Design a protein with these regions (language model features):
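Patatin-like phospholipase
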Residues: 1-50, 58-298
Length: 298
């Protein structure tokens, strides 16, 4: 049995880590990738993700292939899941009680026992609103009041989510400060990284038109506002670094082979299914090269 979530201080050594970008509903691509990796029996030592990357990555740790797309198909159109109704009635675009309590404990149970028994370490990226910096928290469990609070904080999108307090510190979506936690994985001692991005090649993030709203909403947290203002620049640099690492053979990269037109808050299940199917297809296509890379770098 593992203990309560703790913020990472030491740097343990890992042979292979999965680095998972977020992207809200767009991240269902990652679920498709992970389901194929599980079908091929891929073994990793750690998973580190941001936002939706963690939402789907936890199912890799618990060994629950197919769970993400299953509950998306069942509940995405439920007004308590995500959207305007949830925002107006709870103050958050993602229904906290429905998504983080009812689904994992009752409607489509998360296998907590398998997660805790797994040898795979699971890190959630969060942004400290006070410092504006990313923190990568090791979650030994995803229990209510424990690791589940960290998971929720890491996927709490600014402007449409409440700040989550953990250990007296305020947190929001990890994507604000560290959308692609590749460097964090290396700093944690990960020798080889398999990185999953959710945007196709050539995508460049541009400064948000909502920056004035961020500045007004979080005026008490100037460091957070500054980090948000630099987000596009930071993201583009991170992707460039991962691309260079993939070219050198140090890292293996899987990303969408095309743009399905999916949005962050997508409701159309055909589009969501297409994004998931693309993740599966891209990973099946990449598997021969990935298997060779794993053997060559092992």
């Amino acid at each position: 049995m593992r203990s309560e979530p703790t913020q990472t201080q030491a740097a343990p050594r890992y042979d292979l880590g999965l680095v998972l970008e977020g992207g809200a509903i767009r991240g269902i691509y990652t679920a498709g990738v992970l389901d194929v990796l599980m079908a091929h029996g891929l073994q990793a030592d750690m998973v580190i993700g941001t936002s939706a990357g963690c939402i789907h990555g936890c199912n890799f740790v618990s060994g629950q292939a197919g769970r993400s797309i299953r509950y998306y198909r069942k509940y995405r159109r439920n007004r308590h899941f995500m959207g305007l109704y949830a925002l107006l009635t709870t103050g958050e675009a993602v229904g906290r009680k429905f998504c983080y309590e009812e689904i994992p404990t009752r409607l489509d149970p998360f296998d907590e026992a398998a997660f805790e028994a797994s040898p795979v370490d699971f890190y959630v990226t969060v942004t400290n609103v006070r410092t504006g910096r990313a923190e990568h928290i090791l979650c030994p469990d995803l229990r209510q009041g424990g690791g589940m609070e960290v998971l929720r904080a890491g996927a709490s999108m600014p402007l449409c989510s409440r700040i989550t307090m953990i250990g007296g510190q305020p947190y929001l979506d990890g994507g604000v400060a560290d959308s692609v936690p590749y460097r964090a994985a290396k700093a944690l001692g990960c020798r080889r990284c398999l990185v999953v991005l959710t945007q196709p090649a050539g995508y460049l993030k541009h400064p948000s038109a909502s920056q004035p709203m961020f500045a007004a909403a979080y005026r008490r947290y100037p460091a957070f506002v500054e980090t948000m203002a630099r987000r596009a620049e930071t993201y583009n640099a991170q992707v460039c670094e991962v691309e260079q690492a993939a070219k050198s053979g140090e890292t293996f990269l899987i990303r969408p082979s095309r743009d399905t037109g999916i949005t962050r808050m997508e409701r159309d299940m055909q589009t969501i299914d297409a994004q998931y199917a693309l993740g599966r297809a891209d990973t099946e296509a990449a598997w021969p090269a990935l298997a060779l890379w794993l053997k060559a770098t092992g």
